[in-house]
Amino acid sequence: MEYFPAPLEKLVEQFARLPGVGYKSAQRLAFYVLGLPRDQAAEFSQAILDAKDRVHTCPVCQNLTEGDGPCAICSSYKREKDTICVVAEPKDVIAMERTGEYNGLYHVLHGVISPMNRVGPDDLRIKELVERVAQGGVQEVIMATNPDTEGEATAMYLSLIHISEPTRHLRIS
């Protein structure tokens, strides 16, 4: 038995595909969007399409950036180029930047090693990190993955593969 018109049900299903959004929350979001004036709904859908079309990964650090070239952090002459802070997700870069305490570069892995979720080292941006450090000039690699089991496993793996010697490896607490 169908409770909603097909287009509304499809919208609910799309919202329910988002992480952390269950069916009831998806219904609330769908009804909210349905109640928006047409121009605001169009702005919302256009913002999604613009983000998909214009946001890419930085070819240097793998963070998100607009366009195809290096991001603002990698391009900045004010950053310490000999230090790389390794984080799991782009949102972690934002968190680090908000502290105002770190002035080096980043490398975003886009996940952590998680055997339960079938995510191994080859699924992450580890190869890019190894290549980047091998180019030289990096004195310090700071592991800033979360202190949970998966974050610790990822940091341990990175320390065991000896990214590059004599680079100093640190773990934040």
Give the role of each language-model region.
Residues 145-155:
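Acidic, metal-coordinating catalytic cores used for nucleic-acid/nucleotide bond scission
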Residues 93, 149, 170:
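Glycine-rich nucleotide phosphate-binding loop and flanking beta-alpha elements
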Residues 19, 137, 167:
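Conserved functional loop/turn residues at catalytic and ligand-binding sites
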Residues 9-13, 27-31, 42, 46, ...:
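Solvent-exposed alpha-helical segments within well-ordered globular domains of core cellular machineries
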Residues 161-173:
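Single conserved hydrophobic/aromatic residue that forms the stacking wall/gate
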Residues 26, 76-145:
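Extended interfacial segments that mediate partner engagement and assembly in macromolecular machines
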